[in-house]
């Protein structure tokens, strides 16, 4: 078949597809504007936003946050909710665990008066509510807390001790098949909080796994493994927070396996000032000598807590450091891209010389 004949055949096929399934059912990827634009919601931790590679969690996708107990999963999800609301968006929280603390959510920055909450009786109801909210197109982010608490209706109606093999996995697989396309169409972000379990009889390798079967792993665009790696001590040696490490276990939108560390303070949530300090020191924007932190010719304070308080007071300094961190990251990315292009060019020259 000649090139003109192939072109006419393709045009006829496209015309027939659009007649059968509607205009826009098939198109050139370059003309599909949403393929180039990724809307994001900030996580509240600048180090994590940078590790994700796109500046936050993407809208229109499924996100999974998993980790052990008291590792900051709900805190991270609530920060994303608060940031979505600050952008003028609408957020919904499906509290299957019946454990959301409205006072703590408000302390973090969530507007609890506008936050929609649902506490369904069974997993099917929870996932149906999430799908209906997403289908409305009026909700920007939906949090499901947690997958482990999504109990199938038949399990609720049965007796304690009854064996229900694969019920939850089948329920999740069926729901996610419907939910994925709806989220993409309405540009809604769905965040699933998940717990970890240990597989019995695993002698080698990692025995940890997440609940709900394999479907969520496949459908998630981003999976974040969140862990507590230490305590933050305050005055009189009392714990005032936790040091958290997040590994991006899966990322369809940027390179995966990057890590980020940040502080979660008990009465504050994620410390944005702490993230700025860590990144500014790492990028040599702030000079750390001993216990003193200096910025240009100015002493910021002695000790990390003193600098944190200074940044919380001085918003202009906070924004200036944040801007310089972004500039440093962009410069590093441009340098890495230029280096990769030079390497590729050198390889092509070497191949041509053979």
UniProtKB/Swiss-Prot annotation:
Family of this protein: Belongs to the RecA family.
Keyword ATP-binding: yes
Superkingdom to which the source organism belongs: Bacteria
GO biological process, one term: SOS response
Amino acids binding ATP: 67-74
Keywords: ATP-binding, Cytoplasm, DNA damage, DNA recombination, DNA repair, DNA-binding, Nucleotide-binding, SOS response
Entry function: Can catalyze the hydrolysis of ATP in the presence of single-stranded DNA, the ATP-dependent uptake of single-stranded DNA by duplex DNA, and the ATP-dependent hybridization of homologous single-stranded DNAs. It interacts with LexA causing its activation and leading to its autocatalytic cleavage.
A single GO molecular function term of this UniProt record: single-stranded DNA binding
UniProt-listed SMART domains: AAA
Coiled coil, from the record: none
GN (gene name): recA
Location of this chain's protein in the cell: Cytoplasm
One Gene Ontology term, aspect cellular component: cytosol
Name used for this protein in its record: Protein RecA
């Amino acid at each position: 078949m000649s090139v003109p004949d192939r072109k006419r055949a393709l045009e006829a096929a496209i015309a027939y597809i659009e007649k059968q399934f509607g205009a826009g059912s098939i198109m050139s990827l370059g003309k599909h504007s949403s393929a180039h634009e990724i809307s994001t919601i900030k996580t509240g931790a600048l180090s994590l936003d940078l590790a994700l590679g796109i500046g936050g969690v993407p809208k229109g996708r499924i996100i999974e946050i998993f980790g052990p107990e008291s590792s900051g999963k709900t805190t991270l999800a609530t920060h994303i909710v608060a940031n979505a609301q600050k952008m003028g968006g609408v957020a919904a929280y499906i509290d299957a665990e019946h454990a959301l603390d409205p006072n703590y959510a408000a302390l973090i920055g969530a507007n609890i008066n506008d936050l929609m909450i649902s506490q369904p009786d069974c997993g099917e109801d929870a996932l149906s509510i999430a799908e209906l909210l997403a289908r409305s197109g009026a909700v920007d982010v939906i949090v499901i807390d947690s997958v482990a608490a999504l109990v199938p209706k038949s399990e609720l109606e049965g007796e304690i001790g009854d064996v229900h093999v694969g019920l939850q996995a089948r329920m999740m697989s069926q729901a996610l098949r419907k939910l994925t396309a709806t989220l993409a169409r309405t540009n809604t972000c769905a965040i699933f909080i998940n717990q970890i379990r240990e597989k019995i009889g695993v002698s080698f390798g990692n025995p940890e796994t997440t609940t709900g079967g394999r479907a969520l792993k496949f459908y998630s665009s981003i999976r974040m493994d969140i862990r507590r790696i230490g305590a933050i001590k305050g005055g009189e040696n009392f714990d005032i927070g936790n040091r958290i490490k997040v590994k991006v276990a899966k990322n369809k939108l940027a390179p995966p396996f990057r890590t980020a560390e940040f502080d979660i303070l008990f009465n504050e949530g994620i410390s944005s000032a702490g993230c700025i300090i860590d990144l500014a020191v790492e990028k040599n924007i702030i000079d750390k000598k001993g216990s003193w932190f200096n910025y240009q010719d100015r002493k910021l304070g002695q000790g990390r807590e003193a600098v944190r308080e200074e940044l919380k007071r001085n918003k202009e300094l906070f924004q200036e450091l944040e801007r310089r961190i972004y500039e440093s990251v962009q410069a590093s990315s441009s340098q890495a891209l230029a280096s990769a292009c030079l390497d590729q060019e050198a390889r092509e020259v070497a191949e041509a010389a053979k």
